[in-house]
Amino acid sequence: MEIIVKDLIKLWGKPVNQEKIDLQSPLGFVSTDSRTIKKGNFFIPLVGNKFDGHDFLDKVFSIGIQGAIVSEKFNGLVPSGLPHWVV
C-alpha cells in the first residue's frame, strides 16, 4: 500500500510550512535515526534519556527530508521551510 502526503493530512491536518510539499508525493522511507537519513526520507525524532532527536532537525533538513513529526512538547526551533506536523 502506498501512502501519499495527502493521506497524512487526513490523519493530522495540514502541516506547518506546507508550501514546499507535494501533496501527491509518495511518503518516503520513515526513519527515527538522523545518522541514516537520506534525501526524501521522513523523520520522526525520538526522545530518550540521553538524547532528543529534535536536536537533529537542522541536520536532517539540510539533507533534504520530505517532512517530520515534531512533539508538541519540543521548545526549540524547527527549521524554517520544513514541512512538519506537531503531535
What are these regions (language model features)?
Residues 1-87:
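N-terminal leader/targeting and accessory segments in enzymes
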